[in-house]
Amino acid sequence: MMRLKEKYTQNIKPALVKEFDIKNPMLIPFIEKVVISVGAGELAKDQKVLQNVADTISLIAGQKAVITKAKKSVAGFKVREGFPVGVMVTLRKDNMYAFLDKLITIALPRVKDFRGLPRDGFDGRGNYNFGLDEQLMFPEVEYDKILRTHGMNISIVTTAKSDKEAQKLLELFGVPFAKGK
């Protein structure tokens, strides 16, 4: 059993029930999925670089990443329908807990001058979004094999009804938020 999954069932669930006075056990908030995405932009023009980005995200996530394609042509961005525009992977269950554990305990502490994740990344529906500037903080990524550094967006989707519930859930998981607010 995953460390964070065990922590959720033994410690976090009872704490959430107590804090938010939840009567129905099916209403206890949990993390549904984690989506990691990279908008390739200029990188999408070079197929080799885009494949390298997909391989890197696959290494980080522990699951095969998918190259996303444009749904519509947009002349202003010089994008045609069907052109590759990014890379994404959706993590659920054990892969999700493994990634979150790695992110919280290994990757985020390696970020230079890290003061916590911003609290304004909540969307009003209990989901949290934040971005990372580069992929080199993850231990699986080898600097020599990277063609270009790139950032990534990480979305943590929860079943929480409010931002307050979602923030408490993530804090109990050990997500380091910035001080203030």
From Swiss-Prot:
Keyword terms: Ribonucleoprotein, Ribosomal protein, RNA-binding, rRNA-binding, tRNA-binding
UniProt subunit comment: Part of the 50S ribosomal subunit; part of the 5S rRNA/L5/L18/L25 subcomplex. Contacts the 5S rRNA and the P site tRNA. Forms a bridge to the 30S subunit in the 70S ribosome.
Organism: Campylobacter lari (strain RM2100 / D67 / ATCC BAA-1060)
Functional note: This is one of the proteins that bind and probably mediate the attachment of the 5S RNA into the large ribosomal subunit, where it forms part of the central protuberance. In the 70S ribosome it contacts protein S13 of the 30S subunit (bridge B1b), connecting the 2 subunits; this bridge is implicated in subunit movement. Contacts the P site tRNA; the 5S rRNA and some of its associated proteins might help stabilize positioning of ribosome-bound tRNAs.
Gene this chain is encoded by: rplE
PANTHER family recorded: 60S RIBOSOMAL PROTEIN L11-RELATED
The protein's name in its UniProt record: Large ribosomal subunit protein uL5
SUPFAM superfamilies: RL5-like
Coiled-coil residues: none
